[in-house]
UniProtKB/Swiss-Prot annotation:
Keywords assigned: ATP-binding, Cell membrane, Cytoplasm, Membrane, Metal-binding, Nucleotide-binding, Protein transport, Translocase, Translocation, Transport, Zinc
Taxonomic path: Bacteria, Bacillati, Bacillota, Bacilli, Lactobacillales
Name of the featured protein: Protein translocase subunit SecA
Family: Belongs to the SecA family.
Naturally occurring in which organism (per UniProt): Streptococcus pneumoniae serotype 2 (strain D39 / NCTC 7466)
UniProt-annotated location(s): Cell membrane; Cytoplasm
Length: 837
């Protein structure tokens, strides 16, 4: 282990030396750029773009381009990037993460690689965690980019598609991570190419990269529509039942935060819902509602995991930033269960139309980089998942902050008493204090204690984040006391007021350790910026979540033996033990994210295939007849092959039914037309007849443009409907394969294999529906804007007809489960009439 650490440290040192040499080359252009007039300096952008178009690489332009940005920043912003900032910029250009301490000027550092990569004309996305930071950085740094001749756009959720498209067309686009994801999903749901807003994803520079790519990695972005099934009554019933339980009726695993019914709880459920066996197959839906009600009532905590807004809505609290996540809802019915718990209106369940996780969204960029002050602890995950290195950049000035050892108390009460006393003492001498909490509830509790102690203060949490910038701006002033929930990702520096340096700078007090060392380091990093003095102190208790989960029992015995109910234990060993516990949690979380990615990669591969084919259809300026006719041919082949093992009469009747109800006019084909033909001849006969029907259908359309429009809308509508159903089916499969681990099967391998089979089934189903709609649609000539309405189809009654068309004397027991159903539906037997068996 020691050798591994030594190798890592040596590699970092070697990388720093290499970066210093590259930065020195940038500095060699300093005098040359300073000698240029404003117009000459601005003209460099045009020169660089031409050189790039003529074959020069961005790497070869780096030294001059960085020097131009440095000089431009000095003239426009009054800021001149330091050597360490240039080094950070080089790391960003190479698609890695520079770890730069708070206050080291990451925003200015980003200007150099952003400018350089924007020269390609392919677009640069600067990604932030919230719209406030997007607007702030775009306004401040946009002044420099515009002066240098580059266009800057801001992509906000409130903008229209046209405004979004304009923002994405700019050389540099500022946006939040979620908005880029939703725009990507929405682009892959439009019917016309002109309605797409994004260009191909080129280069992303992610601010607070660890927050987005690690903390929110598993967060799925979901575009959904309303579900037709009304379920609010079931949520209320499950909630009422769960609230009636005693502690013995359920089992909570504190470490994994999971919950389930005990034997007595199962008995009570069967009595409450009047069931013989709760876990009978027909009660699967009910157990899902009960599981969500259990989680909502006993795992999800008000003012920690979520808050109830004044509008009676459940708002999720981001566990890493303390902000509420507007518009974000828990999936799979958990949000509705919480609404039932809190007695607020239950919103309709939704059905997922499209989804993607941040992991897979950002892996789609040609080049990805990001900035953070605390990324080294997650280096393995950055490297394994995103192929990104984390390179620590030296500070411009030595760090003077004093990090005290943790103080451990026996109880939460004694801990908070000590926190209030410490804050009061520092307030009285004028030293500003930032108190970091992990929950809204804790910040409110400390606030009440400080009011009682006569200490004026500000509170920053999910309930009042709109005043965030103003509160943080004043947090470094003399005598300021600020309580903040999870300072991670706040993005605003705390600058020291007059006379504060002499008082020891800003003191950061942590009221408990977070699961992640990185979040603790981010809180600490708010103090001691740019060589300022500062202090940090963490207060812990044996009743804290982290301590309860990892080994507080042994320490509890020490407190009891020494009779130290009000006193604290302080030692470096304790701090190391806490960090070891955090490492275990981080390891567990990483393993979970890695497993999620393995599942999500199945969806990613399938999504990329569907979206690529969808894009080809949308952007096609050609007659799609070859594609549609190929679908018709494959559908005919599937149906004929699917009945190859049936008796001749039964086979012909099933094929005839398929042809009548899905392919040809009902009275245009008889049994005699197919009798005596081989399977190959039947396929050819049906296909040739289908081509004539196809030509007849197309001839009803006004002109070539109407034909193209009709073809596109037809294919896209079918693909979108089938893809939505497929996403739902994959979600259900994912929940089901977990149980296969008990049969010594690898759930991920099972999911991959079954998911692949389901995808192939979906493709067959898409081609079947396109065939049926194309051949059976009642086409009326209309004006072009009504093109989407051309598909006035008899499909509904066709479905009823072919479902009723099963030959009466057919022995269903002779049909294989994976063969096509003889009724002609195009579905496998197990998913059609076989299901009813």
């Amino acid at each position: 282990m020691a050798n591994i650490l030594k190798t890592i440290i040596e590699n970092d040192k070697g990388e720093i030396r290499r970066l210093e040499k590259m930065a020195d080359k940038v500095f060699k252009y300093e005098d040359q750029m300073a000698a240029l007039t404003d117009d000459q300096l601005k003209a460099k952008t045009v020169e660089f773009k031409e050189r790039y178009q003529n074959g020069e690489s961005l790497d070869s332009l780096l030294y001059e381009a960085f020097a131009v940005v440095r000089e431009g920043a000095k003239r426009v912003l009054g800021l001149f990037p330091y050597k360490v900032q240039v080094m950070g910029g080089i790391v960003l250009h190479h698609g890695d993460v520079p770890e730069m301490r708070t206050g080291e000027g990451k925003t200015l550092t980003a200007t150099m690689p952003v400018y350089l990569n924007a020269l390609s004309g392919k677009g640069v996305h600067v990604v932030t965690v919230n719209e406030y930071l997007s607007e702030r950085d775009a306004t401040e740094m946009g002044e420099l980019y515009s002066w240098l001749g580059l266009s800057v756009g801001i992509n906000l959720a409130t903008k229209s598609p046209m405004e979004k498209k304009e923002a994405y067309e700019c050389d540099i686009t500022y946006s939040t991570n979620s908005e880029i994801g939703f725009d990507y999903l929405r682009d892959n749901m439009v019917v016309r190419a002109e309605n797409m807003v994004q260009r191909p994803l080129n280069y992303a520079l992610v601010d607070e990269v660890d927050s987005i790519l690690i903390d929110e990695a598993r967060t799925p972005l979901i575009v959904s529509g309303a579900n037709a099934v009304e379920t609010s009554q079931l949520y209320h019933m499950a909630d009422h039942y769960v609230k009636s339980l005693n502690k013995d009726d359920y089992i909570i695993d504190v470490q994994s935060k999971t919950i389930g019914l005990s034997d007595s709880g199962i008995d009570r459920a069967e009595s409450y819902f009047k069931l013989e066996n709760l876990y009978d197959i027909e009660n699967v839906a009910l157990t899902h509602f009960i599981d969500n009600a259990l989680r909502a009532n006993y795992i999800m905590l008000l003012d920690i995991d979520y808050v109830v807004s004044e509008e009676q809505e459940i708002l999720i609290v981001d566990q890493f930033t303390g902000r509420t996540m507007e518009g974000r809802r828990y999936s799979d019915g958990l949000h509705q269960a919480i609404e039932a718990k809190e007695g607020v209106p239950i919103q309709d369940e939704t059905k997922t139309s499209a989804s993607i996780t941040y992991q897979n969204l950002f892996r789609m960029y040609k080049k990805l980089s990001g900035m953070t002050g605390t990324g080294k602890t997650e280096e393995e995950e950055f490297r394994e998942i995103y192929n990104i290195r984390v390179i620590p950049i030296p500070t411009n000035r030595p760090v003077q902050r004093i990090d005290h050892s943790d103080l451990l108390y026996a109880s939460i009460e004694s801990k908070f008493k000590a926190v209030v006393e410490d804050v009061k003492a520092r307030y009285q001498k004028g030293q500003p204090v930032l108190v970091g909490t992990v929950a809204v509830e804790t910040s409110d509790y400390i606030s009440k204690k400080l009011v009682a102690a006569g200490v004026p203060h500000e509170v920053l949490n999910a309930k009042n984040h709109y005043r965030e910038a103003q509160i943080i701006m004043n947090a470094g002033q003399r005598g300021a006391v600020t309580i903040a929930t999870n300072m991670a990702g706040r993005g605003t520096d705390i600058k020291l007021g007059e006379g504060v340096r002499e008082l020891g700078g800003l003191c950061v007090i942590g009221t408990e350790r977070h699961e992640s060392r990185r979040i603790d380091n981010q809180l600490r990093g708010r103090s001691g910026r740019q060589g300022d003095p500062g202090e940090s102190q963490f207060y812990l208790s044996l009743e804290d979540d982290l301590m309860k989960r990892f080994g507080s029992e042994r320490l509890k015995g020490i407190f009891e033996r020494l009779n130290m109910s009000e006193e604290a234990i302080e030692s470096r060993m304790l701090t190391r033990q806490v960090e070891a516990a955090q490492k275990r949690v981080e390891g567990n979380n990483y393993d979970t994210r890695k497993q999620v990615l393995q599942y999500d990669d199945v969806m990613r591969e399938q999504r990329e295939i569907i979206y690529a084919q969808r894009y080809d259809v949308i952007t096609a300026d050609r007659d799609l007849a070859p594609e549609i006719q190929a679908m018709i041919k494959r559908t005919i082949e599937r149906v004929v092959d699917g009945h190859a093992r049936a008796k001749q009469d039964e086979k012909l009747e099933a094929i005839l039914n398929f042809a009548k109800y899905n392919l040809l006019p009902e009275d245009s084909i008889t049994m005699e037309d197919l009798s005596g033909l081989s399977d190959k001849a039947i396929k050819e006969e049906l296909f040739q007849r289908a081509l004539k029907v196809y030509d007849s259908q197309v001839s009803k359309l006004r002109d070539e443009e109407a034909v193209k429009e009709f073809q596109k809308v037809l294919i896209l509508r079918v693909v979108d409907n089938k893809w939505t159903d497929h996403i739902d089916a994959l979600d259900q499969l994912r929940n089901a394969v977990g149980l296969r681990g008990y049969a010594q099967n690898n759930p991920v391998v099972e999911y991959q294999a079954e998911g692949f089979r389901m995808f192939n089934d979906m493709i067959g189903s898409i081609e079947f529906d396109v065939t049926r709609l194309m051949m059976k649609a009642q086409i009326h000539e209309q004006e072009r804007p009504q093109a989407e309405r051309h598909i006035s189809t008899t499909a509904t009654r066709n479905i009823a007809a072919h479902q009723a068309s099963m030959p009466e004397d057919l022995d269903l027991n002779q049909i294989g489960r994976n063969e096509l159903c003889p009724c002609g539906s195009g579905k496998k037997f197990k998913n059609c009439h076989g299901k009813r068996q």
